[in-house]
């Protein structure tokens, strides 16, 4: 071995041994622009890509806790857990799918409901968790939604729901389809009593959820570029055998065609919802914007 080979060999071995392994989960790739992002920075930015502003999917519990005032959250119907009444089995047993989803997410089911305050205004909030079996709606989702709506009715306070779902849970068959009617019925009761219901549609909101509670808000809001519809675009294209328009079923397309009321950036969601709740309950705005302060001055 020559002197240069000895030096190069020593250098390469020392550099490789000095390399430290990067812990798993430190970096995340944006699902839109594919930019590699520091995970902690992404969390601070509420899972919105700082490079392209893509709104990535957001954990349901984190979403609700970041929406409500600090230390004000009280979970509603946390004890409810899905049961395999039909002993359903496809490629896997339903109970095995539930166990796997519960282990992966740390949640009992795909829907979380809470009571708390938003800028000191009492509200009831709920969110689907897409990571739990695609945010599918089963019996527990319907029961939790009704319990949350009943709390809003009892306290005469607004109800805000974030949707992120592939639709009804097929493993519960007709029991899951019944939840469409069940949730729609309690929302009709809320409307009769004049209790505000604000629906926030996030990516994706599809199937039986979009065909029931998600589109029944007194105000329907969407996050940017959220996929919203009944069947997905691929299924529609295969059925009609035509190419769909650019951006079909995205939030911007729906806003342009009058299917939703507004699109709100995630960073602005908390203040926007607070203003809407104040307006809809005939209460003063819970905080002053910079524009209002300038006008008053």
From Swiss-Prot:
Q: Name one Pfam family in it.
A: Carboxyl_trans
What SUPFAM superfamilies has UniProt attached to this entry?
A: ClpP/crotonase (SSF52096)
Catalyzed chemical reaction(s): N(6)-carboxybiotinyl-L-lysyl-[protein] + acetyl-CoA = N(6)-biotinyl-L-lysyl-[protein] + malonyl-CoA
Residue ranges annotated as zinc fingers (C4-type) are 30-52
Q: Can you tell me which residues bind Zn(2+)?
A: 30, 33, 49, 52
Specify the pathway.
Lipid metabolism; malonyl-CoA biosynthesis; malonyl-CoA from acetyl-CoA: step 1/1
GO BP terms: namely: fatty acid biosynthetic process; malonyl-CoA biosynthetic process
Q: How is the cofactor bound?
A: Binds 1 zinc ion per subunit.
Q: Name one GO cellular component term.
A: acetate CoA-transferase complex
Ranges for the region named Disordered are: 1-23
Stored InterPro entries = AcCoA_carboxyl_beta, Acetyl_CoA_COase_Trfase_b_su, ClpP/crotonase-like_dom_sf, COA_CT_N, Znf-ACC
Quaternary structure (record): Acetyl-CoA carboxylase is a heterohexamer composed of biotin carboxyl carrier protein (AccB), biotin carboxylase (AccC) and two subunits each of ACCase subunit alpha (AccA) and ACCase subunit beta (AccD).
NCBIfam families in UniProt? accD
Question: What is the name listed in the Swiss-Prot or TrEMBL entry for this protein?
Answer: Acetyl-coenzyme A carboxylase carboxyl transferase subunit beta
Source species: Actinobacillus pleuropneumoniae serotype 3 (strain JL03)
Q: What is the lineage of its organism?
A: Bacteria, Pseudomonadati, Pseudomonadota, Gammaproteobacteria, Pasteurellales
Task: Identify the gene encoding this protein.
Answer: accD
